[in-house]
Amino acid sequence: MSGLRPGTQVDPEIELFVKAGSDGESIGNCPFCQRLFMILWLKGVKFNVTTVDMTRKPEELKDLAPGTNPPFLVYNKELKTDFIKIEEFLEQTLAPPRYPHLSPKYKESFDVGCNLFAKFSAYIKNTQKEANKNFEKSLLKEFKRLDDYLNTPLLDEIDPDSAEEPPVSRRLFLDGDQLTLADCSLLPKLNIIKVAAKKYRDFDIPAEFSGVWRYLHNAYAREEFTHTCPEDKEIENTYANVAKQKS
């Protein structure tokens, strides 16, 4: 009979269910699904991912989570369906010393991009040509707020003994040089904005927003982000009907 050595921990059984793409198998466009996918990857825990075809939910899923849309999680055979509560549960349960904490150190790292997606949604849904400039201006204002935050050094980066002006921040991500829950929340939305706004409004994030572009370049260099992103065409398909022609 084989037994565990004293102090040996058993890996939890984790299965994440995410929205499937248009082919019914690949990863679909769902920023909340990607958010949890990134968190699990960054935690370094073993887990399985199942894509759910929303056009024909398999019978076993109807039994497992009736009336529930992805993302949802099965953790040691226990179903969890609220993605905010799932995030909190994973952060508390998959904790040091075995797993890293992902909570940001600075509250503003979470808050700074909170209005960006709402401004994008209003912009992409607008069909009135004369109103377009105002919606675009509101979106750019949020990008400017994000850019200012990313270019402003965090307290960790400032030398209190130096008389010189603090330099422009060179940190990789929102809260420092490590990806945190704040990035898992914002990056999937930024990717959607970049793809959909370009496709349907010919909008590019202005090059002058150097902090935003530095952030995106660093993020796209990380597999935890790029390998959890849907294909661009999935994002474009999602917004094909939403982004109606301006009249």
Swiss-Prot record:
<feature type="disulfide bond" description="In soluble form">
    <location>
        <begin position="30"/>
        <end position="33"/>
    </location>
</feature>
<dbReference type="GO" id="GO:0005654">
    <property type="term" value="C:nucleoplasm"/>
</dbReference>
<dbReference type="GO" id="GO:0016020">
    <property type="term" value="C:membrane"/>
</dbReference>
<keyword id="KW-0813">Transport</keyword>
<dbReference type="GO" id="GO:0005886">
    <property type="term" value="C:plasma membrane"/>
</dbReference>
<feature type="short sequence motif" description="G-site">
    <location>
        <begin position="30"/>
        <end position="33"/>
    </location>
</feature>
<dbReference type="InterPro" id="IPR002946">
    <property type="entry name" value="CLIC"/>
</dbReference>
<dbReference type="GO" id="GO:0005737">
    <property type="term" value="C:cytoplasm"/>
</dbReference>
<dbReference type="GO" id="GO:0005829">
    <property type="term" value="C:cytosol"/>
</dbReference>
<dbReference type="GO" id="GO:0007165">
    <property type="term" value="P:signal transduction"/>
</dbReference>
<keyword id="KW-1015">Disulfide bond</keyword>
<keyword id="KW-0851">Voltage-gated channel</keyword>
<comment type="similarity">
    <text>Belongs to the chloride channel CLIC family.</text>
</comment>
<keyword id="KW-0963">Cytoplasm</keyword>
<dbReference type="GO" id="GO:0034707">
    <property type="term" value="C:chloride channel complex"/>
</dbReference>
<dbReference type="GO" id="GO:0010881">
    <property type="term" value="P:regulation of cardiac muscle contraction by regulation of the release of sequestered calcium ion"/>
</dbReference>
<keyword id="KW-0812">Transmembrane</keyword>
<dbReference type="InterPro" id="IPR010987">
    <property type="entry name" value="Glutathione-S-Trfase_C-like"/>
</dbReference>
<dbReference type="GO" id="GO:0004602">
    <property type="term" value="F:glutathione peroxidase activity"/>
</dbReference>
<dbReference type="InterPro" id="IPR036282">
    <property type="entry name" value="Glutathione-S-Trfase_C_sf"/>
</dbReference>
<keyword id="KW-0406">Ion transport</keyword>
<feature type="binding site">
    <location>
        <position position="227"/>
    </location>
    <ligand>
        <name>glutathione</name>
    </ligand>
</feature>
<feature type="domain" description="GST C-terminal">
    <location>
        <begin position="76"/>
        <end position="239"/>
    </location>
</feature>
<feature type="region of interest" description="Foot loop">
    <location>
        <begin position="151"/>
        <end position="171"/>
    </location>
</feature>
<feature type="region of interest" description="Joint loop">
    <location>
        <begin position="95"/>
        <end position="106"/>
    </location>
</feature>
<dbReference type="InterPro" id="IPR040079">
    <property type="entry name" value="Glutathione_S-Trfase"/>
</dbReference>
<feature type="binding site">
    <location>
        <position position="25"/>
    </location>
    <ligand>
        <name>glutathione</name>
    </ligand>
</feature>
<dbReference type="Pfam" id="PF22441">
    <property type="entry name" value="CLIC-like_N"/>
</dbReference>
<dbReference type="GO" id="GO:0010880">
    <property type="term" value="P:regulation of release of sequestered calcium ion into cytosol by sarcoplasmic reticulum"/>
</dbReference>
<comment type="function">
    <text>In the soluble state, catalyzes glutaredoxin-like thiol disulfide exchange reactions with reduced glutathione as electron donor. Displays weak glutathione peroxidase activity. Can insert into membranes and form chloride ion channels. Membrane insertion seems to be redox-regulated and may occur only under oxidizing conditions. Modulates the activity of RYR2 and inhibits calcium influx.</text>
</comment>
<dbReference type="Pfam" id="PF13410">
    <property type="entry name" value="GST_C_2"/>
</dbReference>
<keyword id="KW-0407">Ion channel</keyword>
<feature type="region of interest" description="N-terminal">
    <location>
        <begin position="1"/>
        <end position="94"/>
    </location>
</feature>
<dbReference type="GO" id="GO:0005634">
    <property type="term" value="C:nucleus"/>
</dbReference>
<keyword id="KW-0869">Chloride channel</keyword>
<keyword id="KW-0560">Oxidoreductase</keyword>
<feature type="region of interest" description="Required for insertion into the membrane">
    <location>
        <begin position="1"/>
        <end position="96"/>
    </location>
</feature>
<keyword id="KW-0868">Chloride</keyword>
<feature type="region of interest" description="C-terminal">
    <location>
        <begin position="107"/>
        <end position="247"/>
    </location>
</feature>
<dbReference type="InterPro" id="IPR036249">
    <property type="entry name" value="Thioredoxin-like_sf"/>
</dbReference>
<keyword id="KW-0472">Membrane</keyword>
<dbReference type="InterPro" id="IPR053823">
    <property type="entry name" value="CLIC_N"/>
</dbReference>
